């Protein structure tokens, strides 16, 4: 007990805030390891997983953690404002639910699309369909939901340009994989700036309907849509194409080099 008290006395205000947030929510012991922010010097955490994996809850918990422990402005961007409001903010796994569970005082201004916390943090909620609305902001971080469904990839550019405050501004991306140019670029980064978490729907079976999972396995198991939407696989081949990327890379496909 003495050692524990000594440890508690050494906690900084920021560490106290983080500990309190985790203890109040119950997320720390229940969330899977892959749902917790990874260590490292990354700028983008790309969560590329199947439906029902727990992307929304992960994005909400991570953003609330950041807003509590590092006061500042944060962004939440989804394909449309309705998606951001109904899923990321007001949904059962959304930000409001997480804030209420943690007993964190907040004010959600629905008309402005803005959540204000008592510590001064602001969470700006908006749409990827309006990229110019992200000009002029100075964000510490943000959450980008369903990046694979964004119709305006320049929204990502504007958000990256606006995320520039703090020692390490970071963006968390939660999306079901689609072979867009932007997602393929992020997955292909080799400089350590992007940390990729992959996962399948089945990893969250404890929180999903067994009957629904059985039906999904039966109907979509082994199919192209199942590989993308359930297994979380980024499919780079074009359906119906004469050749696939895997065939090009197969042993014996390429001609041997001349001596």
Q: What residues fall within each predicted segment?
A:
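Conserved RecA-like ASCE P-loop NTPase motor core of nucleic-acid helicases/translocases
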Residues: 72-84
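ASCE P-loop NTPase helicase motor core
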Residues: 149-221
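Walker A/P-loop NTP-binding motif
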Residues: 56-71
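Walker B catalytic acidic pair
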Residues: 145-147
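Pre-P-loop entry segment of helicase/translocase ATPase cores
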Residues: 1-44
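ATPase catalytic-site recognition across NTP-hydrolyzing enzymes
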Residues: 205-259
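Short hydrophobic/aromatic beta-strand immediately N-terminal to the Walker A/P-loop
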Residues: 45-48, 75
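Inter-Walker segment of RecA-like/P-loop motor cores
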Residues: 82-140, 234
